Amino acid sequence: PGATAGVLVKALGIGAAPVQLCWLQFLPYCNPREKGFGVSVNFTNHACMDIGMVVDRKTGKRFMDEHAGRKIKADALFKVIGTDENYPIALCDDATVHAINPSFVKLPLEMGTVKKFNTLEELADYFKINKAPFLEEVQKFNGYVKAEDDKDFHRILKFNKGLDVSKAPFYGIECCPKIHHTMGGVRINTKAQVISAVTHQPIKGLFAGGEVAGGVHGASRLGTVAVIDALTFGMIAGEEFAAMAKKA
């Protein structure tokens, strides 16, 4: 269930110009075992990537700034996943779970996508993480948090407020990107008018805003900005349509 592109298909059918239809945004907080976005997105995002860390099973080490933009993180995840489904492991500790929102972990734990462990060694064994470098990486990360200085990926650590990965029990989950937002769509102008693919002029009476329109955000949209996009161009479209109706 979800978006079916019905409006986009109809608009293209009457001659709307397409723009960047092959550009998709991937959400880097998803789990490969859950259907769709599943129930673990908030846990992976806010507990593991905002506060905790993400590691490559094969190396046991971090490989990205967990605070980077969605595209940067998704690209880094895809590179690690590769062709052999080497899903990275996102993890955090008990102090983090209680500091953010304990409800974020409740349902994923019940469903079994988030796993809980008494020790980091148990976590490494379960997810088949390269144990020795992993344990060293956690200690190094904790040192970075204390110093508020990530020497590897320059992540801003002041937002951790001292929270690291040291208080048992520990939580881990596989993570992967999944399609989240269609960056492309129909071409519009600043008046939210849809542009014709044939005449390159506005199609009379046809307005668009939000995800159905393309060319607004480029290749990667900032989180939550889709709402502002839809509201802004929706208001513009309403004003333009009302003005057009008065002239009719």
Please state what every model-predicted region is.
Residues P1-A248:
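Residues forming the flavin
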